[in-house]
Amino acid sequence: MSQLTQIWIKRMHRGPMDPVSSAKVVSGRGIVGNANQGGKRQVTIVSSQNWEDITAPLGATPDPRLRRANLLVSDVDFVDSRGKLLKIGKVRIRIYGETRPCEQMEAAVPGLQKAMSVPWGGGAFGEVLDDGEIAVGDAVALVGDQGSH
């Protein structure tokens, strides 16, 4: 079963990724306390299996916090997920696209930006559709389009 394994909040642009065990989310805004609010990139998500696969050629699996995503989920393949819904507990997130790796990846680990340049290698981003709370251990499912609300 897929689950939410990590949550990180970025309190300011280019700031550290602070781990938390749960977070409140607001429809149309994102994670409460996170620097990215509103728009289509309210939440960024990476899959642990994908992270392990793309970083394997680097010789060691770096801490996924270096990806600078808000959420780490297990057993989810984001390839062709644009427009689908990611359900985390009772909260839905509409996936709008893939997150592209930036120069911060290369600064963190030499070769990481290139390793992440494969399709969907940087994970996904999306918009929160429901107010609620998410917590490490919540069940996760990627499902087809079920409308916006």
Regions found by a protein language model. Give the residues of each.
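Metal-cofactor-dependent catalytic cores
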Residues: M1-H149
